[in-house]
């Protein structure tokens, strides 16, 4: 896409243009494995009329999904979508001396006053989840009027980025530091971090520990219930969302514990079988999205194919070691401005009264629907929230008191220590 490819003059890194292109031999291997993969027998867990999806993937769904994947799915058609926006790779050095090749999508503005925004994906997601937001931005702005530099990287170990060194116990803070170096090296000091799921952890780490990050916006806040939880008020939509959080804590966290405690086993097992990976990821995409914005089967097959073809399921499980350690990380207050989009049907919805205890919350928007995958479930709403946050946090607009879907004035906090 012409016009969005001029890096700031202050850039010190020299990215190379990147084009998504999977070899025919790897695509043939994928097809062969799909075709040869047997589907297990029907049992109570996967086929009982009374259990629904309580115990995970339904066998009849898997039979149909496998058939569609084998007979009708076209990676090359999806690959064309992935090539729409400029992409690059560049070696970036991390805090432990490691150098990792980072892949990213970029829209570089021609405005001198453009504000840098970094969008970080989670699991099981990719930078391409943000394509609907990039579509909205390029429909709304031209390269000359775009008020932001947009950077959407593949996290280390995901998609087309390189892997952390095998002799390094890599963790989310290290990934955050390395991606901070990416932004600085692109001449984008003074950036805003945005994310959900793992991306929210990256964003928070950068806001807490990286001077170049001036603020952060989250569409998910991973936070254990505060000690004073009973003293904090909840909005009605938040009260309705709390059973989701309780159910997830009781029966939905097994995948994360497996990722964190037996990442070697589950990573190798899922990479060995695309159909097994379809079960593992497909279940989460359906369970974690809102009932009004369920992913199509085509979308699920696209995501699973991308993960399998790039070995992401094996390479990208490292952040979960921290979550499964048994030690709750200390959540210190961050003074930098935070914006927050509340989508009630994610698996761990965080009420705004809880969010206020973690950072200098200056902008908040409460939505009545939407789930874990906001960039493609609710791209317009998420982009509006981010743009509102930028204006509120950096002086272009006051934070008005409005209705349930609008921004609320939630700024303020006492004196707290910065950092994680």
Swiss-Prot record:
InterPro entries: AB_hydrolase_fold, Epox_hydrolase-like, Epoxide_hydro_N, Epoxide_hydrolase. GO terms for biological process: epoxide metabolic process. Keywords: Hydrolase. It comes from the Eukaryota. Its EC number is 3.-.-.-. Pathway: Mycotoxin biosynthesis. It is an enzyme of class 3 (hydrolase). Putative epoxide hydrolase; part of the fragmented gene cluster that mediates the biosynthesis of dothistromin (DOTH), a polyketide toxin very similar in structure to the aflatoxin precursor, versicolorin B. The first step of the pathway is the conversion of acetate to norsolorinic acid (NOR) and requires the fatty acid synthase subunits hexA and hexB, as well as the polyketide synthase pksA. PksA combines a hexanoyl starter unit and 7 malonyl-CoA extender units to synthesize the precursor NOR. Belongs to the peptidase S33 family. This is Putative epoxide hydrolase. It comes from Dothistroma septosporum (strain NZE10 / CBS 128990). The lineage of its organism: Eukaryota, Fungi, Dikarya, Ascomycota, Pezizomycotina. The gene is epoA.
